[in-house]
């Protein structure tokens, strides 16, 4: 069984052979630091070319949450749960040295195409939003050194993990919109 660190390498988390550096000293450039944090928060919140999570899931009929359009290997439920699990993993890795990631790739996807209940769907939505808010709070906190290597990582930084979360969410939210279009459940 691969170790947590080996598992991270196989998922493209990025690794370096260098030892973790001590936390980066303040640059004395608060305006640039503030601008970077604002940009990251904008991306995490669905700004720019990114899609807002709430808009992507709004109005999706319950009966279509488990539907897979022809030619696509996923349903809205699979995408939602995958995004929730991956975002939770990224966040927990960022803040918890004892965190153990799920097994790759099976641990990042639900077993079924459809949510077992409306309650399961709502719980997943709530947890996704909660963890997104936690990532945003981490980035917004001026005491968070965005550039320092995460001590229990392999060269990752909070900056990198925040960008990873924003990019991963944007990618799969785009898939969700495509799936909804193919099902006739997306408004233009």
What are these regions (language model features)?
Residues 111-149, 160-165:
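Acidic/histidine-rich alpha-helical segments that form the ligand environment
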Residues 17, 23-26, 30-50, 54-57, ...:
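Short, contiguous alpha-helical
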Residues 8-9, 43, 63, 135, ...:
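Low-complexity, intrinsically disordered/propeptide-like segments
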Residues 1-26:
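Polybasic, lysine-enriched low-complexity intrinsically disordered terminal tails
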């Amino acid at each position: 069984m691969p170790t947590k660190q080996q598992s991270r390498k196989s998922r493209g988390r990025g690794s370096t052979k260098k030892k973790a550096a001590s936390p980066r000293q303040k640059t004395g450039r608060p305006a640039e630091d503030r601008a970077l944090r604002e940009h990251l928060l904008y991306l995490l919140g669905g700004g720019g070319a990114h899609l807002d999570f709430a808009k992507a899931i709004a109005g999706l009929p319950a009966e279509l949450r488990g539907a897979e359009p022809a030619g696509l290997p996923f349903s809205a439920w699979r995408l939602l749960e995958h995004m929730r699990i991956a975002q939770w993993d990224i966040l927990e890795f960022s803040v918890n040295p004892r965190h153990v990631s799920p097994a790759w790739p099976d641990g990042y996807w639900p077993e079924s195409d459809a949510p077992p209940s409306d309650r399961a769907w709502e719980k997943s939505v709530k947890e996704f939003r909660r963890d997104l808010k936690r990532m945003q709070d981490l980035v917004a906190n001026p005491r968070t050194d965005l550039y320092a290597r995460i001590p229990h990582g392999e060269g990752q930084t909070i900056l990198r993990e925040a960008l990873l979360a924003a990019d991963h969410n944007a990618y799969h939210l785009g898939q969700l919109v495509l799936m909804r279009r193919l099902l006739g459940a997306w408004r233009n």
